[in-house]
Design a protein with these regions (language model features):
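Membrane topogenic/interface segments and analogous intrinsically disordered interaction regions
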Residues: 4-246
Length: 246
């Protein structure tokens, strides 16, 4: 296949992904009320939601619909990336490429579900009722701030749950190994808590709730790296030396 044909195929696949995204956004707008209901269900017992600006409620509908459109488009985009790259891949590479995309999508969904079912309800409850006293203070929040917090946590946990997959890929490529991960685990834990402090509300409980799963996934990644890491064999070294001699 010449470059012109490849570019034409790539353009057609990008157009398909764009059409799927637009359709996903339009359809999601019709169900925006239900999507907002799903998000607010986690904090409805602890917060009273208000719309401060005239356009605030409408903008959240668009924001949630766009995110839903992205979610619908991602599997389609993954398929077209695989289909476009498949002719240039070996059979083993094609299988590994396909498994990486499927596992990556599954892990991201697990991370979002983990945040929605476990982390966010606990975090919202603590932020609302974690401090005793001042019962006369009514807890309210703008719908924009609430949606921003929810979507941020979903994206963070979705990405965090990709850590084992990234470790597997880098270990198979020989870029990292379990020994290296063990040596830098102290620094990694400090970085994890720093990141958690930046992306979470300013309280120690929220920080630990985000950092805890990240630290656990880091140690799981060390274990997986030990399974998938393959050090360079002597045969490969000899082949490299022969190529250098030539």
């Amino acid at each position: 296949m010449c470059i012109r044909d490849s570019l034409k195929e790539l353009r057609n696949r990008l157009i398909i992904c764009a059409v799927v995204f637009v359709v996903g956004v339009v359809v999601s707008l019709a169900y925006a009320d239900r999507l907002i209901d799903l998000l607010t269900a986690m904090g409805r017992d602890y917060y009273q939601f208000v719309s401060i600006a005239p356009q605030e409620k409408l903008m959240q509908y668009f924001r949630v619909s766009i995110l839903a459109g992205v979610i619908v488009t991602v599997p389609v985009a993954f398929y077209h990336i695989y289909a476009f790259a498949k002719p240039g891949l070996k059979k083993s590479e094609s299988f590994f490429f396909k498994m990486v995309m499927l596992l990556g999508l599954a892990l991201f969904c697990v991370g979002v579900l983990f945040a929605y079912k476990l982390m966010m309800p606990f975090m919202l409850r603590f932020l609302s009722t974690g401090i005793e006293g001042a019962e006369y203070i009514q807890t309210t929040t703008s719908i924009e701030s609430y949606v921003n917090l929810c979507l941020t946590m979903f994206i963070i946990f979705g990405c965090v749950f990709e850590m084992p997959l990234i470790t597997i890929i880098l270990s198979k490529m020989g870029i990292i190994n379990p020994t290296l991960l063990k040596q830098v685990r102290g620094v990694a834990i400090v970085i994890i808590f720093f990141i958690a402090a930046v992306v979470t509300p300013p309280d120690i409980v929220s920080q630990c709730m985000v950092a805890g799963p990240m630290v656990l996934l880091y140690f799981i990644s060390i274990f997986l790296s030990g399974i998938f890491y393959k050090p360079k064999s002597d045969d490969d070294d000899e082949d490299d030396e022969e190529e250098d001699d030539e």
